[in-house]
């Protein structure tokens, strides 16, 4: 059974939808949301990412987005919904309303749509970040109506607005909390730092009023700025699904509640234990809020690559309307529009130049440092910058179909994916928070039973320290933040990871297998030799061969036809043309049967090519690809073409060797030619004379011995090989990045991108391991310290205040370490 037939018989691929989620703070939240979503009927899988605050949900059939939204809400979190109000033109009756609603609801990412005939408006609820106006407009037009946007999104303007609002809210909360906590801290602990503070308080307001004031300040902190912890933590406790917020609530409430008892009814406590810990409760809230604020700022920096990509597209374009160019919103541009670009302006959408000449800076898209010349019929890409001249072009792709939109989607998909290395984290986070609560209970019991006097005070302080120091956030952020920054940095270098897991697999590669034509070489062969056999004229042979090759799409055919044109040789019509991949082409030209191909093609037809064995050996030794031509069943000529090696290829091979990788070349060329090229470039292994369908078997052979193989090809002809390899890398694809079989796409044809991708993969996985080590080592080592295991030997106990500071900084450390990937510059 062929691969195509297997695909045809396979089940349809699940539909994927992304959901923005508010309220997640730690890895336990991630696990809870995933569990809630996967319980929805029709959901195949759910992948929740704490760093991006998004869930990628795969559906088996028709997506039931409303059910997923309800599941997220039921789990205690808020799905991020944006509301668009749209003006619908052309509706006349209730049937129109039904038709428009149905069309809008069918758009991926639309949670609900309500259309009002009287006002001629539609209110559309969008899952934030998954659908844009152009998709809604296309749906409405497809139903036979016209649409125009009347006002911007109201409920949520998108991820950036959400992050900015959250950051502002946290900043205000931290400021208020600090202003109230500082005097509270000085009243209770000031005498440890400033002599005379205690006497001053006693001589002015007195001890009783001091306690009342501490109670008031601590209460304001807990139920003012700290109320966010209660709103999320308490419901999760009641659902028996505690999270990070629940730990903060338990710890601070225990300290505050004990202090309230000690303040107002101290007689119910054992003698000598009526101590207050108001400052501990307030400082814990303040430090955790500060940690959240710093974490939110760092999270914003991890997504800067996406922000930069989104910022590449201009808001308006000068479009030809009614015989003159007028400024129009980018959302109003449609395929077929004629657009004018002046020097220094950004190109708004993808298109083809119809007039003018200029140089365009495509570095932000392809990573190519030098501007590219654009003339008539040249393709231009939205988001690139016109440098010198003025050009006019016709729009070919707009909205979500543009290359820039596809790149953004690929990067977002990669950033939201999980790596195999995260499996351990997922297993641990399921029981981590309940285990911490159990540890706190055991700590309290142990100190209350066996601790020194006052045992109740010791038990309370140490139990609170255990609750506060535990940090599932660091574990939840360890992997996704590194993936976000790593894939974002890769995008800046023109490297697109279509699948996040390719980051890990690429790092494990042992062998890099390269297709020759178009990958190692420029893919533009040139005719270098044509030696006619006795009884044939060279120009006559070239005429017949070039005529036949006009119907072939192979690069070698283009070289032969181009050579004939340069000599002024006109081609003739061809009858009975046949092409056999990996062998050659045949047909009738001017009444004569012509066959052109490799030696195996002629041998199959019973034609002996040994008469040109000497020439073939010399041509092959010099790296040229020999072909043979037969006319009327007789050997007529040997033809040689040479495909120049890319200037960047030798350095790329050296870079791969420096990374400790074996380099192999897979080609359909004869062995002599292939080995000559391999020697010149320093390639370790050669798999020659491979038919297109034989590349898959070649990769399987290279994989023998347990080796992991990364295959680099053009992404189109090499699709089966790209899919077979452990990691498939499509190189030099230009504007075509929608290659399902490739795990990684290199925007430019520079093979150095392969070494950069591998180096970045290694750096990212190392960064993830550092984060995971820190997250696990932090919790494994400091939770016992907070419980007081060092006290019997050293007399050291960990204050809940220091526990809060350590917990707040642990997530910031993980994020800061991930951000180091932004400066990675692989050679």
Curated annotation (Swiss-Prot):
Family as reported in the entry's similarity comment: Belongs to the cation transport ATPase (P-type) (TC 3.A.3) family. Type IB subfamily.
Catalytic activity: Cu(2+)(in) + ATP + H2O = Cu(2+)(out) + ADP + phosphate + H(+)
GO biological process annotation, one example: copper ion homeostasis
EC number from the UniProt entry: 7.2.2.9
Cited InterPro entries: ATPase_P-typ_cyto_dom_N (IPR023299), ATPase_P-typ_P_site (IPR018303), ATPase_P-typ_TM_dom_sf (IPR023298), ATPase_P-typ_transduc_dom_A_sf (IPR008250), HAD-like_sf (IPR036412), HAD_sf (IPR023214), Heavy-metal-associated_CS (IPR017969), HMA_Cu_ion-bd (IPR006122)
Subcellular location field: Cell membrane
Function field: Involved in copper transport.
Residues annotated to bind Mg(2+): 714, 718
Active site: 515 (4-aspartylphosphate intermediate)
Keyword check for Magnesium: yes
Name assigned to this protein: Copper-transporting ATPase 2
Positions of transmembrane segments: 174-194, 210-230, 246-266, 271-291, 430-450, 458-478, 771-793, 797-819
Binding site for Cu cation 2: 93, 96
Gene of this entry: actP2
Its membrane topology: Multi-pass membrane protein
Main location, first listed in the record: membrane
Ligand binding (Cu cation 1): 26, 29
Species whose genome carries this gene: Rhizobium meliloti (strain 1021)
GO cellular component: plasma membrane
UniProt GO MF annotations: ATP binding; ATP hydrolysis activity; copper ion binding; P-type divalent copper transporter activity
Domain HMA span(s) in chain numbering: 15-80, 82-148
């Amino acid at each position: 059974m062929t691969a195509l037939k297997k695909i045809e018989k396979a089940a349809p691929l699940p539909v994927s939808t992304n959901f923005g989620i508010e309220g997640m703070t730690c890895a336990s939240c991630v696990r809870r949301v995933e569990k809630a979503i996967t319980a929805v009927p029709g959901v195949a899988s759910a992948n929740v990412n704490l760093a991006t605050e998004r869930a990628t949900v795969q559906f088996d059939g028709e997506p039931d987005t409303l059910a997923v939204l309800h599941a997220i809400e039921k789990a205690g979190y808020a799905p991020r919904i944006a509301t668009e109000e749209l003006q619908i033109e052309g509706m006349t009756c209730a049937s129109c309303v039904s038709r428009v609603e149905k069309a809008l609801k069918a758009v991926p990412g639309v949670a609900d749509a309500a259309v009002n005939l009287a006002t001629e408006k539609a209110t559309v609820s969008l899952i934030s970040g998954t659908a844009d106006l152009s998709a809604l407009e296309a749906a409405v037009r497809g139903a036979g109506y016209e649409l125009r946007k009347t006002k911007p999104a109201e409920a949520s303007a998108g991820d950036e607005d959400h992050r900015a609002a959250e950051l502002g809210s946290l900043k205000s909360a931290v400021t208020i909390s600090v202003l109230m906590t500082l005097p509270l801290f000085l009243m209770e602990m000031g005498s440890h730092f400033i002599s005379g503070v205690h006497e001053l308080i006693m001589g002015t307001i007195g001890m009783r009023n001091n306690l009342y004031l501490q109670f008031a300040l601590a209460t304001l902190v807990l139920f003012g700025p700290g109320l966010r912890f209660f709103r999320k933590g308490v419901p999760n406790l009641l659902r028996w699904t505690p999270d990070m917020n629940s730990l903060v609530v338990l710890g601070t409430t225990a300290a505050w509640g004990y202090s309230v008892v000690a303040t107002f009814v101290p007689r119910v406590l054992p003698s000598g234990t009526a101590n207050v810990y108001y400052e501990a409760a307030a400082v814990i809230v303040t430090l955790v809020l500060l940690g959240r604020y710093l974490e939110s700022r760092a999270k914003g920096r991890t997504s800067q690559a996406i922000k930069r990509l989104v910022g590449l597209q201009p808001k308006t374009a000068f479009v030809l309307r009614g015989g003159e160019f007028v400024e129009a919103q980018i959302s109003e541009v449609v395929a077929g529009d004629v657009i004018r670009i002046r020097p220094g302006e950004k190109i708004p959408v993808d298109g083809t130049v119809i007039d003018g000449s200029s140089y365009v800076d495509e570095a932000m898209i392809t990573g190519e440092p030098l501007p590219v010349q654009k003339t008539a019929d040249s393709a231009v890409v939205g988001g690139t910058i016109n440098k010198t001249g003025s050009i006019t072009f016709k729009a070919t792709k707009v909205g979500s179909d543009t290359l820039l939109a596809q790149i953004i989607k690929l990067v977002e998909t990669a950033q939201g994916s999980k790596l195999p290395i995260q499996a351990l984290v997922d297993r641990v986070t399921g029981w981590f928070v309940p285990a911490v609560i159990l540890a706190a209970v055991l700590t309290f019991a142990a100190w209350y039973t066996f601790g020194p006097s006052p045992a109740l005070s010791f038990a309370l302080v140490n139990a609170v320290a255990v609750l506060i120091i535990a940090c599932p956030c660091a574990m939840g952020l360890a992997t996704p933040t590194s993936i976000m920054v790593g894939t974002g940095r890769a995008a800046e270098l023109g490297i697109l990871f279509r699948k996040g897991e390719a980051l890990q697999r690429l790092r494990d590669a042992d062998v890099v297998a390269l297709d020759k034509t178009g990958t190692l070489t420029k893919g533009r062969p040139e005719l270098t030799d044509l030696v006619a056999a006795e009884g044939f004229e060279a120009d006559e042979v070239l005429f017949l061969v070039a005529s036949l090759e006009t119907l072939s799409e192979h690069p070698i055919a283009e070289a032969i036809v181009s050579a004939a044109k340069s000599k002024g040789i006109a081609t003739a019509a061809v009858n009975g043309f046949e092409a056999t991949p990996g062998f050659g082409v045949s047909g009738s030209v001017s009444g004569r049967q012509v066959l052109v191909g490799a030696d195996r093609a002629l041998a199959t037809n019973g034609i002996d090519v040994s008469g040109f064995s000497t020439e073939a050996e010399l041509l092959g030794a010099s790296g040229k690809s020999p072909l043979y031509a037969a006319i009327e069943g007789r050997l007529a000529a040997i033809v040689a073409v040479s495909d120049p090696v890319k200037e960047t290829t030798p350095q790329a091979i050296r870079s791969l060797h420096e990374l400790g990788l074996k380099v192999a070349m897979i080609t359909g060329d004869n062995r002599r030619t292939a080995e000559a090229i391999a020697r010149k470039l320093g390639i370790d292994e050669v798999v020659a004379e491979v038919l297109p369908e034989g590349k898959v078997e070649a990769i399987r052979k290279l994989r023998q011995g347990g080796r992991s193989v990364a295959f680099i090809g053009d992404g189109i002809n090499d699709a089966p090989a790209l899919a077979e390899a452990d990691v498939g890398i499509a190189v030099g694809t230009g504007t075509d990045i929608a290659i399902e079989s490739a795990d990684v796409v290199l925007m430019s044809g520079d093979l150095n991108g392969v070494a950069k991708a591998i180096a970045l993969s290694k750096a990212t996985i190392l960064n993830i391991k550092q984060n995971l080590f820190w997250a696990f080592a932090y919790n494994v080592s400091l939770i016992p310290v907070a419980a007081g295991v060092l006290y019997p030997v050293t007399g050291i106990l960990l204050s809940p205040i220091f526990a809060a500071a350590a917990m707040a900084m642990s997530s910031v450390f993980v994020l800061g370490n991930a951000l180091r990937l932004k400066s990675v510059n692989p050679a």
